[in-house]
Each structure stands twice: as structure tokens, then as C-alpha cells.
């Protein structure tokens, strides 16, 4: 008679239990006794420590780390920024050597030099910043670099290039120049370069952070397929809960130590432990708990379909249990509250007045004023405003590598808005914002510009209009140096904007560079102090430190301080929260709202995070194919999830739940912010209000 399988924990235990059922007691017992061969360890750390320099215990990036990953296992690594995740990844690949302890990769001792080539041949790693691993000037050459170095035959390399490009949706860019691609496109190429190696172990270090939702899904689908079908071992470092849920096991790191391991669904619902380790509950779980506090009996779930099902059952049960007067009509989604009594937030009220206003008011021309005075007067009336008409741009124009990035952009951003820009990878978002402070200049603004002579019968090109903060960017007479002091730009990976020896010198650089006269040292100190304190950094503690010694989050704050120190009227941020842990994202968005209130009239963020857009922006523009195809409040944009999905975009989590419920006949009318969603569901159910934390 067959006995019950023994108690074994973890991924190895799950697989051995399955083998016990298939092979029987005798074979399973032999496997358990041997502890090897049948299920090999792809990665094994034994009491590993690592320090980037100091000998003190606090300086260690990894401390006494022991864990193993079985061949074919999919493991997600979670943790706040600076917890040691990236260090761990680099130790696996042999890019770093441990201070002490032992690391084995595919049964090979990583400390032995003779094993280095074999390990690196079988371990592929994709970094967060694709610029750090781009080596060639043509995409296909970049992807071929790895296979060439491990001796793959030419014909096979060609097939692998095609496979990898197709897997990441970049086949049409095979002969393009990587430096001319968008950040998200570069990231796809970096992932393709590793896929072409067909490694036994694949490590992705926040490598989907810069991708649009469709790109993230395409990459994770490929990785999941390779894991399931080819048994490739995957180590996925991520901040996205939906990615972590794909894994067999999740590891949580804090201050260089592994502090939790288990099933992702279990790990992501442990509120007390997550807060202890500077992490936050995923947004779906927080919504569940807020609704449960209101009296709806729902379980913690992590997907919109699961939450929709939970809500449908809970609302139906409540509808049957209470009188009709207590329960809202499914047609209006409100519990007896007229629409006019539901207040809009300050942002949304401002947004309502801005929507539909495409052109700024134009004052009557003062014929007595000089041309310069007229420009200055108009600028004063348009401070913080952006008006764009017929804007187009081609990279590598006139060459075989020509690529149309913008194609007739039409957009007005009103002064005072907190504005969002969304769009799939390569849609023209970054190219557009680089026009706003003339990093990319319009041809008519170049000093050597001469109008093209038209041939007989040839139509003139469309008139381009681009005014930013009152400056005419089509006019070569515009003071572009002054413009750049008024339009601050924070790029993707803002920490790479740092260059000076000290934090003080870095933050003060723009202030000194843009001033027409040498500013007084006391004024510079005062301005730098104010900028650093605004971004949450202590002036006395930071001023003499090297910016390159700071943590990732501190570097990002110093970079933002260096931009706002000139007190720009417009602040533009390209993916400001990309690569940050959930707590870091929340803090950076709170910081931007503080800057919007105290420093800058208009704030513009480019983002792939639809929840970030819905929670923070008064209005947003959707870019596709180099054009703006929609501009509206997020609450209106996300009413058409199918259209956005077709563009490679996502919608907020709450919009997905709302759509699911609508399909079941329950209409919840909210602005898709988590707080408002909780309120509207509570109103629908006739539940007394409480505090929503989401």
C-alpha cells in the first residue's frame, strides 16, 4: 500500500512530491536520499557576502546569503531599491566575485577561473539600462555579438537573430541604429541579444521597466515559454506584481539579506512583513482590504478578473440580503447621491476647465510696441503653456536610416496642468518632449536656415507652430538659453545627468550656467539648499558628498534638484518613476506634486504606468505613430480599454475591474483612481464610508 508523500517544502519539494506520485515510493525515496542528479541545482549560494569596498558589516551589499534555484525553476526576486538584488544577479553571472562564501552555477564553482567562460556562456543577463550593454552600431550586429563570441556557426546565428527579433517584436528594426531607437526599443534589443544566446539560465534585472505594457507582456510571454518548454532557469528581478505572479517562487531581499521566500501570491499579501522591509502591498490587495474594512466580504486577490468575481459575488449577496432602498441601482452606480454632490479633486476641477481649450487667448496687438516688447508681453501671458501645431521630425533625414518620429503633432497643454503623456514604445513621446526646450531644434530656428524654394505647382509645407512658456521655438531670434532655464528636463534614468564632484556643484551648475550675470555665492547656496530640501535631502549632509556614492533613489532626487534650482515654469520628466520600488514610486510622485505646488507652474510626465497617470494627472495625451490621437482627462481616456489595448497600452487596474463588472451587469462609475473606485463600490453597495488607503 502506498503511503502519503513525505513533507517537503519549497519548489524542490513540489517537484519531488509529483515524482513520488508518478514513480512510486521506491524511486522517490532514492531521489530524496541522494538529494542530487534527478533535480540539479542551477544556482547555489552558500553563506555569500559581498562588499563594494568597506570592511564594516554595514557596508556589505550582500550578507550571509544562502539559497538555491533548481534547474528549470522560475524565481522572482523582490526588494526595495538598494536591497542587493542587482548585486546578487551580477554574482551569478560572474561579473562580481564574492568577498567570501561559495557560489555554484550549473554545478561549476564560480570562484575557479577555468569555469568563468562556461558559466558566462550559459548565463544571460539583461540589465535595467540597455545603453550599458549595447556594443554595435547596427541592431543585428548587436544581437549577433554574443553568439559570435561563443562560437555559434554563421547560419545558426542568422536564425537566432530572426528568432530573437521576432520574439520581442523588433524585426522591422533589424538594420536600424540602436542609438536612434527609443528607450523601450533599446531594451527590447538588449533582451533579444540574450535570447539569441539561448542560455540555460536567464537573468532579467528590471529589464522590462522601460517597456510599454504590450512590450512587457510580449517579453514575459517569451521568457515564460522558454522556461516551460525549454526548461530554461529564470531569475526575474522585478517590481511588477503581475510579473512576480508568473514565478514558481518569490524571494524578498532587504539590506543585503534574504528575508522571505514562498509562493508569490502568499508573499505579496503579507502587509506587516512587506512594510517592515520597505515594500508596499500591491494596489489590488490594498483595494481588497479597503473594501473589506467597509464591510464587503472579499478575499485578497491580485488580478482584475479575480477581484471582479469577488465583487460580483459580494454585491449580489448583499443585494439579496438588504432592502432595495439600501442598495444602489446598477444603472447609476450611486447610493442615492446626486452627481453634483460628489466633489472632484482640485486637479480634476482644473482639468475640466482646461479640456477643450486648444488655443491660448491672444491679446490685441499693441502697434506702438517694439518687436522685442511684443514677444515679451505675449510670453508673460503664456507662462507655463505649450501650444503645438503640425510638428514633425525625422531622424537621419535623407539617409537610408531615415525614421519618422513625429508626424504632425497637435497638442495644447494649459498653464498649471499636471499633464501625462502615454503611448507605446517608439510612438514619439520622448522625441516630442525633447522639442520643448529645444534639445531638438526646429529647422526654422537654426541660424543658417533658409526657406526652401518651391517648384512650380508644389504646395508649401504646413505651417508649424510651437510656443513653449511664451517662447516661439520656430523663430531663430528666440533666446534658447533663457528658454532652457524656464523649461526643466529630467530624462529617463535622471541619475545619469549627474557629473560634478560634489552634490553642491552638480545642483548649482544650472543656476550658474543660465544666469546672465555671475550670481552671488550666498544666493547660490540659498537656492541649492532650497532645492535639496524640496526633494527631501539634507543640505548639510549632502552638499560635499560625491553624487556617485549615493543610492539610486538619492541620485534621482539630486538630479531633480539640479533641474528645479533654476525655478523653471515647466518641468518635464520622462519616466520619472521607472525602475523604482513601489514605495519609491509613491515618494517620487508625492515629490512632484510638491514641486508642482511650490516651484513649477506646469508639470509633464511621460509614463507607461496607467495607474500612475490616472492617480496623478489632470489630463493626458495618447501618442501613436508620431501623432496625438487623443487628449482628455484620464477618467475619459480609460473608458475605451479596447482601443488603448490595441495601441499596445494598458488601462488602470480599476478600469479592468470596472469592465469585468459591467459585463456582469454592474455599472460602477468612477474616475479610475483607487480611492474613488473604493468610494463608488461602497456607494453602490449602500455601505457607510470609511477611509480608503489605496
Question: Language model features by range: what are they?
Answer:
Residues 93, 437:
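Helix-to-loop junction immediately C-terminal to a conserved catalytic motif
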Residues 198, 567:
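Conserved catalytic motifs of ABC-family nucleotide-binding domains
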Residues 101-111, 119, 445-475, 483, ...:
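Conserved ABC transporter NBD signature motif
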Residues 177-181, 185, 546-550, 554:
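Conserved ABC ATPase signature
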Residues 78-80, 422-424:
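The feature captures the beta-strand-to-loop junction immediately N-terminal to the Walker
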Residues 202-205, 571-574:
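Catalytic Walker B motif of ABC-type/P-loop ATPase nucleotide-binding domains
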Amino acid at each position: 500500500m502506498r503511503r502519503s508523500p513525505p513533507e517537503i517544502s519549497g519548489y524542490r519539494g513540489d517537484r519531488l512530491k509529483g515524482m513520488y506520485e508518478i514513480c512510486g515510493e521506491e524511486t522517490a525515496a532514492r531521489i530524496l536520499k541522494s538529494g542530487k542528479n534527478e533535480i540539479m541545482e542551477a544556482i547555489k549560494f552558500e553563506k555569500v557576502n559581498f562588499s563594494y569596498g568597506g570592511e564594516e558589516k554595514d557596508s556589505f551589499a550582500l550578507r550571509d546569503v544562502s539559497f538555491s534555484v533548481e534547474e528549470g525553476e522560475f524565481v522572482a526576486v523582490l526588494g526595495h531599491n538598494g536591497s542587493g538584488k542587482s548585486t546578487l544577479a551580477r554574482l551569478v553571472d560572474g561579473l562580481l566575485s564574492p568577498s567570501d562564501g561559495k557560489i555554484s552555477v550549473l554545478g561549476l564553482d564560480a570562484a575557479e577561473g577555468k569555469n568563468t567562460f562556461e558559466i558566462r556562456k550559459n548565463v544571460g543577463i539583461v540589465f535595467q539600462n540597455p545603453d550599458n550593454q549595447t556594443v554595435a552600431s547596427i541592431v543585428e550586429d548587436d544581437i549577433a555579438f554574443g553568439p559570435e563570441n561563443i562560437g555559434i556557426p554563421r547560419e545558426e546565428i542568422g536564425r537566432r537573430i530572426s528568432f530573437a527579433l521576432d520574439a520581442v517584436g523588433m524585426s522591422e528594426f533589424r538594420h536600424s541604429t540602436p542609438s536612434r531607437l527609443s528607450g523601450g526599443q533599446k531594451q527590447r534589443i538588449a533582451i533579444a541579444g540574450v535570447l539569441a544566446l539561448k542560455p540555460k539560465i536567464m537573468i532579467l534585472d528590471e529589464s522590462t521597466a522601460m517597456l510599454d505594457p504590450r512590450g512587457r507582456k510580449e517579453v514575459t510571454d517569451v521568457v515564460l515559454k522558454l522556461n516551460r518548454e525549454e526548461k530554461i532557469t529564470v531569475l526575474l528581478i522585478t517590481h511588477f506584481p503581475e510579473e512576480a505572479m508568473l514565478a514558481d517562487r518569490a524571494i524578498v531581499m532587504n539590506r543585503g539579506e534574504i528575508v522571505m521566500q514562498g509562493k508569490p501570491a502568499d508573499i505579496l499579501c503579507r502587509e506587516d512583513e512587506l512594510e517592515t522591509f520597505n515594500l508596499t502591498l500591491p494596489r489590488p490587495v490594498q483595494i481588497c482590504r479597503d473594501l473589506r474594512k467597509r464591510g464587503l466580504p472579499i478575499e485578497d486577490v491580485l488580478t482584475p478578473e479575480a477581484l471582479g468575481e469577488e465583487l460580483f459575488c459580494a454585491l449580489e449577496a448583499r443585494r439579496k440580503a438588504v432592502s432595495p432602498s439600501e442598495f444602489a441601482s446598477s444603472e447609476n452606480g450611486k447610493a442615492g447621491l446626486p452627481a453634483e454632490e460628489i466633489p472632484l479633486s482640485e486637479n480634476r476641477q482644473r482639468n475640466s476647465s482646461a479640456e477643450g481649450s486648444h488655443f491660448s487667448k491672444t491679446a490685441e496687438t499693441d502697434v506702438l510696441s517694439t518687436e522685442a516688447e511684443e514677444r515679451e508681453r505675449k510670453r508673460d501671458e503664456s507662462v507655463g503653456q505649450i501650444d503645438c501645431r503640425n510638428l514633425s521630425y525625422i531622424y537621419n533625414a535623407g539617409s537610408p536610416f531615415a525614421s519618422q518620429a513625429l508626424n504632425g503633432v497637435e497638442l495644447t497643454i494649459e498653464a498649471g496642468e499636471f499633464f501625462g503623456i502615454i503611448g507605446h514604445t517608439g510612438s514619439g513621446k520622448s522625441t516630442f518632449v525633447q522639442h520643448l526646450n529645444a534639445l531638438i531644434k526646429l529647422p526654422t530656428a537654426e541660424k543658417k536656415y533658409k526657406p526652401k524654394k518651391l517648384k512650380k505647382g508644389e504646395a508649401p509645407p504646413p505651417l508649424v507652430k510651437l510656443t513653449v512658456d511664451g517662447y516661439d521655438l520656430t523663430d531663430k531670434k528666440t533666446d534658447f538659453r533663457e528658454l532652457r532655464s524656464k523649461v526643466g528636463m529630467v530624462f529617463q534614468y535622471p541619475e545619469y545627468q549627474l557629473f560634478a564632484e560634489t552634490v553642491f556643484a552638480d545642483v548649482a551648475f544650472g543656476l550658474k550656467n543660465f544666469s546672465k550675470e555671475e550670481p552671488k555665492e550666498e544666493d547660490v547656496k540659498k537656492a541649492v539648499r532650497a532645492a535639496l530640501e524640496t526633494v527631501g535631502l539634507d543640505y548639510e549632509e549632502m552638499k560635499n558628498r560625491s553624487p556617485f556614492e549615493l543610492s539610486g533613489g538619492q541620485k534621482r532626487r539630486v538630479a531633480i534638484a539640479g533641474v528645479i534650482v533654476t525655478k523653471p515654469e515647466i518641468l518635464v520628466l520622462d519616466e520619472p518613476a521607472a525602475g523604482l520600488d513601489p514605495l519609491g514610486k509613491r515618494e517620487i510622485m508625492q515629490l512632484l506634486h510638491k514641486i508642482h505646488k511650490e516651484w513649477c507652474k506646469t508639470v509633464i510626465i511621460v509614463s507607461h504606468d496607467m495607474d500612475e497617470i490616472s492617480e496623478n494627472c489632470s489630463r493626458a495625451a495618447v501618442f501613436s505613430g508620431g501623432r496625438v490621437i487623443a487628449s482628455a482627462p484620464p477618467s475619459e481616456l480609460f473608458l475605451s480599454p479596447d482601443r488603448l489595448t490595441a495601441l499596445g497600452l494598458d488601462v488602470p487596474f480599476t478600469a479592468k475591474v470596472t469592465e469585468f463588472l459591467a459585463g456582469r451587469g454592474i455599472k460602477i462609475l468612477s474616475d479610475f483612481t483607487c480611492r474613488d473606485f473604493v468610494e463608488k463600490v461602497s456607494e453602490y453597495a449602500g455601505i457607510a464610508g470609511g477611509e480608503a488607503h489605496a
